Design a protein with these regions (language model features):
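Residue-level signature of the C-terminal ends
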Residues: 45-50, 84-92, 122-130, 161-168, ...
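N-terminal "cap/leader" segments of large eukaryotic alpha-helical scaffolds
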Residues: 1-34
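Short sequence/structural elements of tandem HEAT/ARM alpha-solenoid repeats
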Residues: 14-18, 52-60, 91-100, 129-138, ...
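Residue-level signature of alpha-solenoid helical repeat scaffolds
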Residues: 38-45, 60, 80-84, 118-122, ...
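Nucleotidyltransferase catalytic core that binds NTPs
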Residues: 117, 121, 142, 152-338
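Alpha-helix N-cap/helix-start positions at coil->helix boundaries
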Residues: 32-34, 71-76, 109-114, 148-152, ...
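HEAT/HEAT-like alpha-solenoid repeats
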Residues: 20-31, 60-70, 99-107, 136-144, ...
């Protein structure tokens, strides 16, 4: 732009292999954060100019910076650069990077892992359907982890996946039925955490529902309306079932504020928000056993026929082990929340 001769500078940048030197410099704790950010832009610029011999190593380097960098700005610069280069990677390379980021969630140090979901959620949407389903299943397993911090970041990742999921159908051209089924699975996993017995997990679920679904600037209003019609009744039930302490009150208020704002905006510009109602009623005979998968499948099949299914719970059976009614009620809630 200044009409200066930059031949010498271009020779320095693109005439030599500087990638390994940058890798080494970025991993030094003594390197100032501003230099690391410039190095990230330089590595991405190398790829933009056709030097793709080290593409996988550059993306792996970015994923490492997201996981271990001490400076938040460097993490975000690396994350944005990784997402910008994701489409250039081969399928197996994308899976390798996604697995590395997923391992970062399992560290359990929330101060480091809390920045990963924002980028893992979007990056995972570059995986083909089979690998994406495997990623969702691994996140599902993490939701049962004993460490609440690991559960929280897994939940955040599911929220980002659901929020940005509309991009996936454009990239991989799946049928509407398959796409909707996966979207409902993601929503079900988030709702299942709202029935969790740990208050911190329930709070994180409320945060995800409020910010990544109904408060999202990415999700289309039509998609929000469809999800609201599916989960409104269950959401209302679970909010009243596990009220938690004073801090949960503020989480609940923030989530309801996002939902209220969405409803007001949708009714003003899009039309009425409808909720699904079923006029047909079915009672599940005997005591519902949440540990028996066949019981749950029977109830789901009846529900798919258009029935509202009521489940009976008492203090007995379940292999003859007596438990308090409210304890059993909470176990059943966790079983059917998805």
């Amino acid at each position: 732009n200044l009409r200066l001769d930059t031949t010498a500078q271009r020779e320095v940048l693109y005439g030599h292999d500087v990638v390994s030197d940058i890798f080494l410099e970025n991993l030094k704790s003594a390197t100032p954060w501003i230099l690391k950010s410039v190095n990230i832009k330089l590595l991405a610029d190398q790829v933009d100019h056709g030097k793709r011999d080290h593409l996988l190593h550059i993306c792996a380097h970015f994923s490492n910076l997201i996981k271990v960098s001490e400076q938040v700005g460097v993490r975000h610069d690396a994350g944005r650069a990784l997402l910008r280069l994701a489409h250039l990677l081969a399928t197996d390379q994308r899976n390798e990077i996604a697995v590395e980021l997923l391992k970062g969630l399992e560290v359990g140090e929330y101060e480091f892992s809390k920045y990963i979901p924002e980028y893992l959620g979007e990056f995972a949407l570059w995986l083909p359907p089979e690998q994406l389903d495997d990623m969702i299943e691994r996140l599902h397993i993490l939701l049962a982890n004993g460490n609440e911090r690991i559960v929280s970041v897994a939940l955040d990742t599911l929220g980002v996946l659901l929020e940005c999921y509309s991009r996936y159908t454009v990239r991989f051209h799946e049928s509407e039925e398959v796409s909707e089924e996966r979207r409902m699975k993601l929503l079900g996993l988030i709702l299942s955490c709202l029935a969790n017995y740990r208050e911190q997990v329930r709070q994180e679920a409320l945060l995800v529902i409020g910010q990544h679904i109904f408060g999202s600037q990415i999700l289309a209003e039509r998609d929000k309306s469809r999800m609201f019609s599916l989960c409104a009744k269950k959401l209302l039930f679970l909010l009243n079932e596990n009220k938690g302490g004073e801090l949960s009150l503020y989480y609940r208020a923030a989530t309801l504020s996002h939902i209220d704002r969405f409803i007001a905006h949708y009714q003003l510009f899009g039309g009425l928000v409808e909720t699904r109602t079923r006029e047909k009623i079915a009672f599940f005979p005997g005591t519902f056993d949440p540990f028996t998968l066949s019981h749950k499948e029977i109830a789901k099949k009846i529900q798919e026929l258009g029935f509202t299914v009521f489940l009976a719970i008492d203090e007995f059976s379940w292999s003859k082990k007596t438990q308090p009614h409210l304890v059993r009620r909470q176990i059943v809630n966790m079983s059917i929340a998805d």
